[in-house]
């Protein structure tokens, strides 16, 4: 959930995702990160090979986000789905679809294939959009379980684990 640091311990004393899974019975770690002000799907595992496979850019594992933005969305859409760079490095083109709009805030679905630091927020900023909320809803073929409340977790099903292992 928002307000948690995606790490196992924090020298500043902030809440960590490790506290959320302390009762799982294994030592697990996060696969990738979510920003402190982001929310949604976060995979935790004790499998180093799976972690490396999902994080390695050559595997192009999809990460899908719902992003609530303000700004000129019409102008931003072709920028977001076209060739972009972050820190001088080219990004794989994102898949972007426009969703609902309410009160000047537009919901976008953005699928990326890399996991650079604050990538979606920085892409939106480059396109002239301000992100008001960001929620990861999918990694690879595994989607956020909408029955879970923020901070809750569950083990992967055999089918979900098999889908993730395809990237090995």
Regions found by a protein language model. Name each.
Residues 1-168:
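Basic, flexible Lys/Arg- and Gly-enriched helix-loop patches that mediate nucleic-acid binding at interfaces
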